[in-house]
């Protein structure tokens, strides 16, 4: 991965965010955040009062009112700055993607074949269904499917990965992305989208903050904050007539300051930034989420469906042993296995040749000198091999070799059946070798479980997340690998229909399911899953069915996606806890100061020993503004994540952010009060 990572407080982003924070003072922007809109109205009201007092139109301290007004404006500006910083990071990422888009001409074919006549047209004029020809050095003008040819493609502009990939017609590697470059050969591509709907266009729209919609949890929290704000607004509004009736009317400036300190301005000012930053962190992991809803769902996931190959195991099965049938020498089996693999360029085939060389010093032989014919593997026969004179050597799956042997008049030995079961039980894949109608024995192919994966699954289990391994292996092999890897369950001999049924079963139990996929056959299950991470190297159908795309095409990334989702939810919950606890502490500063003249008994609540009512109120307002600034890095970066159970996580957050939220204001407000007093400002 070579994509450049932005510093948390990039100087250029900070400068732009400061300008954007001022622009966001517009009431057309402020009303979208009801909590901060109340602060904005209070700032405007106190500003007008300060001007009126300075001009003699109203009685009261113009200096005190102006000071409160200035810090209320700072409160709004700091909240705007937090949101602008988060949006700025997303826009910077989007701008880097926009740089990939290039104005180009396309060779539009008049017929869907390589040698058809071409028309040179601007790429933006292409429509869904059009067929284009691209050759070495060309920029692919549209998203589409390869219908003819094969080529090496540089996708670094999209993925950040410098290694080229192969794209060819047929199979799961036929999908191409507009904006990538052909390095060699040629492709005939059928466009699958219209201009403005390409994967690159969708990526840009996804990461730009302006396109972000609030998630369900964010909406629910916003409603709670609005409800609290309305309660405190009504409570504050009723104080003025009561205090006026008692003969000691509380000033409007004090009431505005009281209201701002009572309502949850800290989380209200940071809520939008947390959501935008969550999507930005997901992009930092090279995963594109279609919406904040997808990121949020990742944090709530409690079932992970994980492909065995590449996710749980290394995915490159290696020959580990030769197990001869009764009456067959191991060297004879190794010689036949090596001969059948001489032209097999798969990792498994090469490992068989190497193992035979290591065990019996059997050197590679040249097929031409042997006058041999290689028989390639096909999905229909499920075996491969070699024909040398009268010898017919085959290797393949148990069922395929059984049919082959019986078709040639032989029989499948019972002792080999037992060996097959034993190999599968140990978590290896049995590959049977036969010569003519005679079964020679088994090659055991071992797929290595990734180091540390068992510990990661144990952490997920602590968090209440169930892990399910998906594999095409038989049940015995699947059970052995599942036990070695430490997953909670497995689905063996998996088919697309079985995956879909399993997802629906878990969802019917009220669980949220996450999975990865890359093929067209994965599309139904991806569309059904709550969090569906499609591989960028996969088919167009898979990418359209998923709600996230992993640009690195790494199936293990699903675990990281869940961690990022949980971190976003934890950040929102932690800062909400801190904000509400903050408000409780601020009551002890501002309520005695505001009402001591009306109700002298409240003086006993001045536990901080603040200098005067004016210094107490101003200190609380200043602290209320500054705490937003101090929490901006936490909102952008996210709270530190630890894989704990829900109850342990709740206890930890209550101690850190609940108790911290209570104590920090006492220290902060007292320190500000001392500074104001020593400087003679109050």
Swiss-Prot record:
One GO MF term attached to the UniProt entry: P-type potassium transmembrane transporter activity
Against Pfam families, the record matches this protein to: E1-E2_ATPase (PF00122), Hydrolase (PF00702)
E.C. numbers: 7.2.2.6
Question: Is Metal-binding set as a keyword in this record?
Answer: yes
Catalytic residues at 307 (4-aspartylphosphate intermediate)
Binding residue positions for Mg(2+): 518, 522
Describe its membrane topology: Multi-pass membrane protein
Annotated membrane-spanning segments are 35-55, 62-82, 219-239, 254-274, 588-608, 616-636, 656-676
Q: Where in the cell is it found?
A: Cell inner membrane
Binding residues annotated for ATP, in chain numbering: 344, 348, 377-384, 395
EC primary class: translocase
Primary location? membrane
Q: Which family does it belong to?
A: Belongs to the cation transport ATPase (P-type) (TC 3.A.3) family. Type IA subfamily.
Query: How is the quaternary structure described?
Result: The system is composed of three essential subunits: KdpA, KdpB and KdpC.
Q: What is this protein called?
A: Potassium-transporting ATPase ATP-binding subunit
């Amino acid at each position: 991965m070579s994509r450049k990572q932005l510093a948390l407080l990039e100087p250029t982003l900070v400068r732009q965010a400061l300008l954007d924070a001022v622009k966001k003072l517009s009431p057309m922007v402020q009303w979208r955040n009801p909590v901060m809109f109340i602060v904005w109205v209070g700032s405007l009201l106190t500003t007008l009062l300060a001007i009126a007092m300075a001009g003699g139109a109203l009685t009261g301290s113009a200096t005190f009112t102006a000071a409160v007004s200035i810090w209320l404006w700072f409160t709004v500006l700091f909240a705007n700055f937090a949101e602008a910083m988060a949006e700025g990071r997303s826009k910077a990422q989007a701008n880097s993607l926009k740089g990939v888009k290039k104005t180009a001409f396309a060779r539009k074919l008049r017929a869907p074949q390589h040698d058809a006549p071409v028309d040179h047209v601007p790429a933006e004029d292409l429509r869904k269904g059009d067929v284009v020809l691209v050759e070495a050095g060309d920029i692919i003008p549209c998203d589409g499917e390869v219908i003819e040819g094969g080529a090496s493609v540089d996708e670094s502009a999209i993925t950040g990965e410098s290694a080229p990939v192969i794209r060819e017609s047929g199979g799961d590697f036929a999908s191409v992305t507009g904006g990538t470059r052909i390095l060699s050969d040629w492709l005939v591509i059928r466009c699958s989208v219209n201009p403005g709907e390409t994967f690159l266009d969708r990526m840009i729209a996804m990461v730009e903050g302006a396109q972000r919609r609030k998630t369900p949890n964010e909406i629910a929290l916003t409603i709670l904050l609005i409800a609290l704000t309305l309660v405190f607004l009504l409570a504050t509004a009723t104080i003025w007539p009561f205090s006026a009736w008692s003969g000691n009317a509380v000033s409007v400036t004090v009431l505005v300051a009281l209201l701002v300190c009572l309502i949850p301005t800290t989380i209200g000012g940071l809520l939008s930034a947390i959501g935008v930053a969550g999507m930005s962190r997901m992009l930092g992991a090279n995963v594109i989420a279609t919406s904040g809803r997808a990121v949020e769902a990742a944090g709530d996931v409690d079932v992970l469906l994980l492909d065995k190959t590449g996710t749980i195991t290394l995915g490159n099965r290696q020959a580990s042993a030769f197990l001869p049938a009764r009456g067959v020498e191991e060297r004879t089996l190794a010689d036949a296995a090596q001969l059948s693999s001489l032209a097999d360029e798969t990792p498994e085939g090469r490992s068989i040749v190497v193992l035979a060389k290591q065990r019996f010093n059997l050197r590679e032989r040249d097929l031409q000198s042997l006058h041999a014919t290689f028989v390639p593997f096909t999905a229909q026969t499920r075996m491969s091999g070699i024909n040398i004179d009268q010898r017919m050597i085959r290797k393949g799956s148990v069922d395929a070799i059984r049919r082959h042997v019986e078709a040639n008049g032989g029989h499948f030995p019972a002792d080999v059946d037992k060996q097959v079961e034993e190999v599968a039980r140990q978590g290896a894949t049995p590959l049977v070798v036969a010569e003519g109608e005679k079964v020679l024995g088994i090659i055991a192919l071992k797929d290595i479980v990734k180091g540390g994966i068992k510990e990661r699954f144990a952490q997920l289990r602590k968090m209440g997340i169930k892990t399910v391994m998906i594999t095409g292996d038989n049940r015995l092999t699947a059970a052995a690998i599942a036990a070695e890897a430490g997953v909670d369950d497995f689905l063996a001999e998996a088919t697309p229909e079985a995956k879909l049924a399993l997802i629906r079963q878990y969802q019917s139990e009220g669980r949220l399911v996450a999975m990865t996929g890359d093929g067209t056959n994965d599309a139904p299950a991806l569309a059904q899953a709550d969090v569906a991470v499609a591989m960028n190297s996969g088919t167009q159908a898979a990418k359209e069915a998923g709600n996230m795309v992993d640009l690195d095409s790494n199936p293990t990334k699903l675990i990281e996606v869940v961690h990022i989702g949980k971190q976003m939810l934890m950040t929102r919950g932690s800062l909400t806890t801190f904000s509400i606890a903050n408000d409780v502490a601020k009551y002890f500063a501002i309520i005695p100061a505001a009402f001591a003249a009306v109700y002298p008994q409240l003086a006993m609540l001045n536990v901080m020993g603040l200098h005067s009512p004016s210094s107490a109120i101003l200190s609380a307002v200043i602290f209320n503004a500054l705490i937003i600034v101090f929490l901006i890095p936490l909102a952008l970066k996210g709270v530190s994540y630890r894989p704990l159970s829900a109850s342990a996580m709740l206890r930890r957050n209550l101690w850190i952010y609940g108790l911290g939220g209570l104590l920090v204001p006492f220290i902060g407000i007292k320190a500000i009060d001392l500074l104001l007093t020593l400087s003679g400002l109050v």
